[in-house]
Structure formats: C-alpha cells, structure tokens
Amino acid sequence: MKEHLVIFDTTLRDGEQSPGASMTMEEKVRIARQLERMGVDVIEAGFPAASRGDFEAVRAVAEAVSNSTVCGLARAMEADIDRTGEALQVNQNVRIHTFIATSPIHMKNKLRMSPDQVIDQAIKAVKWARQYTDNVEFSPEDAGRSEIDFLCRVLEAVIDAGARTLNIPDTVGYTMPDQFGGLIRTLRERIPNSDKAIFSVHCHNDLGLAVANSLSAVMNGARQVECTINGLGERAGNAALEEIVMAVRTRQDYFPCDTRIDTTQIVPASKLVSGITGFPVQPNKAIVGANAFAHESGIHQDGVLKHRETYEIMRAEDVGWGANKLLLGKHSGRNAFRSRLKELGIGLESEEKLNAIFLRFKDLADKKHEIFDEDLHALVSDEAQIPEEHYRLLSLHAVSETGEIPSAQVVIAVGGSEKQAVSEGSGPVDATFRAIEKILDSKVELQLFSVNNITSGTDAQGEVTVRLQKAGRIVNGHGADTDIIAASAKAYLSACNKLHSSLERTHPQI
C-alpha cells in the first residue's frame, strides 16, 4: 500500500499575502469549504495574532470545517500561541504551526538571540502549544541559510518536545531541486529521532522551482507538502497544489506515495480562488489553465482523436474540466436556489443576504438562458465584496461610436446622496472610470484592469478585476455583469469601497 502524502493548503494564509489578494472572512470560509470538499488534509486558515480580522477568520473556518484539520500560524511566543489556541478551540481537529528563525543572520540581527536561546525558545513554544493540541508543527524560518549542524540540533529538540511535523521552508525560492531533496535526506539521516515526525516542505517559486523542489523533497522522504491553489502567494507565489497532486497521481510508477485529493474538485477550486482574489489563471497554466488540454497542432489533434493517450497524460474530466453543471433558470424558485448554494458550500449569514443575491440571480436569468455554478460563485463574490457600500452605482450610460470620442455618464450614490458626472475617454471603460473619479476624487492609481468570461457563450457574464493603489495600500475590486462596461464600473467602485472602509480586513495590505 502506498504511503500517504499530506496536502497542507496555505491559500488562506500565505496565498493571501499576494498584494491585493486580501479576502473577507466570508470568502475565506467559502474557500475552506471547497478545500474540504476536495479532501485537503490540513487547511492553514491564518495568523490569529496578526489582527482581529485574522483571528475571527481562523475561528470562522474552524467552525465551518469538520473533516479537514484546521491550522493556525503562531510565532514561537506564548501570547501568539494562546491567541491561536483560542481561535481554534471551537474545533477538535486542529493544529498549531509555530516557527522561529534559525539562520545566523536572523538570529543575530532580527531576534538578537544566541543559538542556545533559540533552541530553548523553540522547545518552550512547542510545549506551550501542546496545551491546546497534540498536533503541533514546527518551522525553522530561513532553513536554507541555516547551518546544518544547528538545524539538526533544533529539529531534534522540538521532536523531543512533542512536534509531530517538521516543516522545512525554502523561503526565498533559491534552492535547486537536487540541493533541496538532499537537504531533506540529510536531515532525516542525521537526526536520531527523525522517525517520530513527518517532514514537510514549503517552497516558494522565485526561480520557478517550487513544484520541482517539493517533488524532489517527496522523493527524499518528505510526506507533507505545503502549497496553494493556483500557486497563489507573495512575489512569484508558492508551490501549486494542483501541480503537486497531479504530478504524484499521474506518475504513480515513480512516486512511493499518493494523496487523498478528489481531483475532480481541482478546477472548481481554481476558479473559486481566482474569482475571489481577482488573480486570473494564465491560459497555459498546467492543469487549470484554459489551454491545458487544448490541441491546435493538426498532428496532435489527429493523434488524440485516434488514441487519447498519444498526447494526453491525464484526462481533463479527472481534474474537473467540463463539470460546470447547468442548473437553474428564470423559473427557478428560492428553495432551489438556496439548495444549490448549499451544495456549492456557500453559506449566507442572513435571509436578507439571500434575498439580495436571489434578486440579482433573477436579473441575470432574464439576461442569459443558462446559469452555471460559476455564475453563482460570481454573484455571491460580487455581493459580498464589502460589508457596507459607501459608493453604489445607480445608473450608467456609455456611448462609443466609430470615429467619435467615447463618453460616459454615471450616477452614484455617495453616502446618502446622489451625484452624477459625465466624462470622455479613450474608450467607454476609460470614460466610465474618469466620470467616477470626477465624483469621488479618490486620487488612486489604477494598477490592473482584467476581464474574464465566467462561462462560455456570447451571453456569458464578464468578470472584471480592478486593482487600485493609494498611499501604499493595494486592493482588488470585482464586478460581474453581462455588460462589460457595467461590470467595470462595479469593480472600480468595489475597490474604492474597500479603500474607504475602516473595517479591518482579514489580512490588511498596508
């Protein structure tokens, strides 16, 4: 029987550190439910000591999830660990992940601690965490620049203290696959009690090697991989969950282990995370990109038609492509609508919220004949972008005529009053944004404007992502509509609402 490879998803914690990827508590819960549906072993829900918002989000995920282990991150400090334990206490199946830096440069310049003091602090942290759960994970931060002898001492000590998982991070994505795999092998061979803990890896993608390094570690004895949906993460991202899982699943002739992931849930998870964060998936992205299973070459097409395995090493349907179920229409009632949301793992906190989204669903059903799961996710994401709308689009009239300068007239509710403006621009979207700015005068910098179709067909909803920056704060706004200009205006106002809101986000981008 194959050994079990633990999949530890950190989309909600490390993935959220991408600039602009901040999620609301409700969005974190939706993603967590999808991860649980997929069969993810451990869900790292956040860093409870970082902010009140992060604490509440971790607690909400712990309340919502029952099958996957819910994990919270904590520095090797009693106060951090207590806060994490408090957030997780609503669930019995939990883990505390604690860490401290072990490289000479970090110990000297950041911690201002001697090596012996660091070991003592690590031991105390693990023992303190075990007051809340026996499932404790320890990470030596900046392990790649740590001295191997000292690293072995620290890890041996925390195993004796009760750590069940040892996570080795490649924090800046600098290591080569042979090096990283060799490091895992060396640690397992040199640490006397290494058989009492699972070795884990957490690789970043700065050189495009996060997945390769993770798989090399697996071949050298690691039995947990920390990863994110779509490889989401700060800088160049983390190891992509979908690539790790499908590499191991597809090459069972090569790997001595396998995961328990339901791979048919991979594409739905990818689309959900992309829609919530506003980070589109590149078309040629492995597994989840739109072109991942497309063949344009005549020779390739002929081969696939004659025998699929000539050019396809896995089936598109095995990872969830083609699973966008046609479900509802203009005659569907509230009960059917509520039931389908529940099946998708979407929980709404009030009847008022359900009514608001149901009305938008009815409006959408009048515009397009076929409503898919992706449309429902987009409706919910669009409605839940900000708890309190300070700016709301009331009407939009955009004109674009060949040979003429495009213009737009917008009417926006600002607080309790209505304001309107007209502006010209290089296109109808530009004119719309300029008109909005005449009213808001927000002095923001537009960093990203992206349009994606949610489903196929000319009547499909378009989902627009707008990224704005102001005074060092970066936010994403989303808008969905069958009218791209309207979706663009909604997205811009969604981002402006986030900038205006004084509510604490689950991971503030300051």
UniProtKB/Swiss-Prot annotation:
GO terms for molecular function: 2-isopropylmalate synthase activity; acetyl-CoA C-acetyltransferase activity; manganese ion binding. Keywords: Amino-acid biosynthesis, Branched-chain amino acid biosynthesis, Cytoplasm, Leucine biosynthesis, Manganese, Metal-binding, Transferase. Homodimer. The lineage of its organism: Bacteria, Pseudomonadati, Pseudomonadota, Betaproteobacteria, Nitrosomonadales. Its EC number is 2.3.3.13. Catalyzes the condensation of the acetyl group of acetyl-CoA with 3-methyl-2-oxobutanoate (2-ketoisovalerate) to form 3-carboxy-3-hydroxy-4-methylpentanoate (2-isopropylmalate). This is 2-isopropylmalate synthase. Pathway: Amino-acid biosynthesis; L-leucine biosynthesis; L-leucine from 3-methyl-2-oxobutanoate: step 1/4. Pfam families: HCS_D2 (PF22617), HMGL-like (PF00682), LeuA_dimer (PF08502). It comes from Nitrosomonas europaea (strain ATCC 19718 / CIP 103999 / KCTC 2705 / NBRC 14298). The gene is leuA.
